[in-house]
Amino acid sequence: MANQYEVLGKAPGPEELKKLSPNDVHLTIRGLSAGYGKMEILHNFDLTVSKAQSLCLIGPNGAGKSTILHSIYGFTNIFSGKIEIDGKDITNLTPAQKLSSVGIAYILQDNSVFPDMTVEENLLMGGFTKEKQDEAYEEAERIFEKYERLRNRRNQPAKVLSGGERRLLEISRALVMKPSVLLVDEPSIGLEPRYIDMVFEILRDLQQTEKKTI
């Protein structure tokens, strides 16, 4: 049986990875080894991502794609290496610190909508770390203005939303903190085909119009 290197080819080195993000580097990962408990999943991992770039990680189940996102956000144990935003070392910051002070938001692959809360209440949960709650309300209004699907259901329980609308709500909730980086884990998982294009169009708009790094 062919091994993974024969099937996928030689793993790219640091210089080859830099070619994917040649300008205005925003996120840098250097020599990262990380995992859960004492188990090391990532081994000496490198990555660079430019500002307003959309970069997709592709690989088989168990390859470590989610672990990379978890490590950036602070959900794993870091054994060695460094994670930087604009040259600032953020390796040991907590998830809350990365969200509030660095501008990194994580959108889980599992359904994280609170079904019995209204769409507006779900949206405002995204601003729970804001010191001034008025700012969360202002950002929520901007989001309602941008997305008619959510605006029309703002006072309805989230459980009435379609799968695509729930994913839109999850993405929008992350936007309340006005992040510069969106970590999106399996954005199309569990969605009907008719909603998949909608979700990717939303992400493309956030990258191109609002200059988010995704």
Q: What are these language model-derived features?
A:
Residues G81-D89, S100-S101, E135-A140, E145:
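Conserved ABC transporter NBD signature motif
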Residues P157-L161:
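Conserved ABC ATPase signature
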Residues V176-S180:
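A short, proline-enriched helix->beta-strand linker immediately N-terminal to the Walker B motif
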Residues L182-E186:
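Catalytic Walker B motif of ABC-type/P-loop ATPase nucleotide-binding domains
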